[in-house]
């Protein structure tokens, strides 16, 4: 395939994927417009995350991620949640979850992430490139927060390998878009149960919950993840500037601590009743001790590459909130994750939250 054919194929693929994304989001936005004006803290939030490297005109490395989560309204106790209260309620009396002045949320989620080498048309294993891999998981998140600080504890459990249905998912998408099917999934990581626990603490600086009009705030955070899928420490921050900023803690990309950030019950700014927008810039660094998608299987021999100990993500994006919905898009640049990786990666992230 010459350069012109490659550019034309990439353009066709991107147009098809944008059309598919639009068709997925349109019904959700229609539902948001039909719903009455609400204060989002008093209702739960359904959030769809979609990430794909087609926004960066590539088809490699972290190639696709999707996640659907439900976050409860603000609660006094985790056990008050009708969905997962029986499980989450065991943490109600733990001293490190704060006193009665904290508002709480319970989040449940399901997601899948896929990773591929550079050439998905090559059926052979290429030792210098990352392994084929997929991660299919469910999560339980516990959030306890005050006006200017939010804590998140997240438990993810799932499967890596053929059980994660990465090959089937990628073939389904490629067939829907008229692309050639990937050929190398026979070389993917072997089946393994994955368990991860993540804690994150986030602050809000220069935040005025009663403000309207143009404003800005800054959301620094630290976190740690432990498990056989990922083990790393995280340090990052998000700067927001815009009109009628939502009274929340931002909306990040798919990550170990991604839970929908519902506003505080006591907020005086019911931003669901009005239109707002903002631009944001986010930077995150991770000190990586383990990444199963680079290190390979934990308990058996498998394809692996030499990971880099430090990885950074830089993001630019915008978000719009109106009535009971919030839509955001981020363009994410990720530094090289392993030795010999030909280039850094760029991918896009779309997040849609509907409060009801």
Where is each model-derived feature located?
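Short loop/turn motifs that connect adjacent beta-strands in outer-membrane beta-barrel proteins
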Residues: 33-43, 74-104, 145-152, 205-218, ...
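Short glycine/proline- and aromatic-enriched beta-strand/turn motifs that initiate or cap beta-hairpins
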Residues: 33-78, 105-111, 115-120, 288-294
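Outer membrane beta-barrel transmembrane domains
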Residues: 45, 118-119, 238, 243-356
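Transmembrane beta-barrel strands of outer-membrane/channel proteins
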Residues: 46-52, 106-114, 155-161, 201, ...
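Sequence/structural signature of outer-membrane beta-barrel proteins
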Residues: 51-55, 115-119, 160-164, 204-208, ...
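Residues that define the transmembrane beta-barrel architecture of outer-membrane proteins
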Residues: 60-66, 132-136, 151, 191-197, ...
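Long, hydrophobic/aromatic-enriched structural stretches that serve as scaffold segments
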Residues: 90-166
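Extracellular loop and loop/strand-boundary signature of outer-membrane beta-barrel proteins
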Residues: 123-128, 181-187, 223, 300-304, ...
